[in-house]
Amino acid sequence: MSESAVAADPEVVAFPGAQAPARRRFVDSGGLRIAVHEWGDEQAPPLLLAHGGFDFARTYDVFAPLLAAGGYRVVSWDQRGHGDSEHAALYTWDADVRDALNVLDSVSSEAIPVIGHSKGGSLLTHLADACPHLVSKLVNIDGLPSRARHPDVAEHERSRLLAKELADWLDHRRVVASAARKPGTMAELARRRGRMNPRLSHEWLLYLVAAGAQHDADGWRWKLDPSMRFGGFGPWRPEWTLLRLPGLPVPMLGFLASISEPMGWDTTEESLRPHLPPDAEIHTLPETGHFIHIERPHEVAERVLRFLA
């Protein structure tokens, strides 16, 4: 595991309120190098942030400093195949959970608060349920699913459904094994990302390109492994998280978007309520899309800090 201060990059694009992490280091997770980024005082109480699919830790460059200013050592990591972490031969939900545990183990041996957005929210919900001795409180930012479970079917039919998922997933991995992401200018990459994040400003998306893409000889490319695809968490369905919610053993604060977006989950309080633990606190933010912490960083940070106090 190595650690260093983050050096200034002459090609970084400025954005109001954004601060690059103060430190970066790497954690070994089963032989894979996982990049870990930190904001705030190293001696402050730690909390863990998990990003969503197709994102990276630097998407918290506005939100994380607000939590650090509230007195926390804020730690996030680039999930395998994302950002500055190494690409892997295969990607599975279980591998992501193991990576999260390895990062958490490098931060604290005691229970700490965890915050996740989208896929990261479901990931940390899973972790909090499985390892409540490691998690003191959970904040889930639009990572709570409400899609209906598969109806009860015969076991041989259930196995057939899973077999097709696995075959499709492995076929995709074979086809893209030697693929490379399409290059472009910074502005082109920002516009492409904007098609998936239509509510985020072009200025913010340019900032993300500078933080999360690499400049090759033929142009800029996102660092994301080209084999990744939506829903590419391996044989896992988001709605399985619903089964864990009623007995969640740690306090939970949840945020939901009110505007549908391509990368969003379209979960509503009404559909979620039957599955929530009794003391869960849920807020639906009006006129807000999937990237709640980017659209409303100050409001979300204030609510989170009150919840953690």
Predicted segments, located by residue:
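Alpha/beta-hydrolase fold catalytic core
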Residues: 1-47, 69-72, 109-110, 145, ...
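Active-site loop/oxyanion-hole signature of alpha/beta-hydrolase fold enzymes
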Residues: 27, 32, 69, 79-115, ...
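Conserved HGGG/HGGXW glycine-rich cap/lid loop of the alpha/beta-hydrolase fold
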Residues: 37-86
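Hydrolases whose catalytic domains are alpha/beta-hydrolase-1, hotdog thioesterase
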Residues: 123-127
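Flexible "cap/lid" loop of the alpha/beta hydrolase fold
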Residues: 129, 136-181
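Alpha/beta-hydrolase
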Residues: 179-263
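Conserved loop-alpha-helix segment in the C-terminal half of the alpha/beta-hydrolase fold
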Residues: 246-288
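Catalytic histidine-centered segment of alpha/beta-hydrolase-like enzymes
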Residues: 285-297, 301
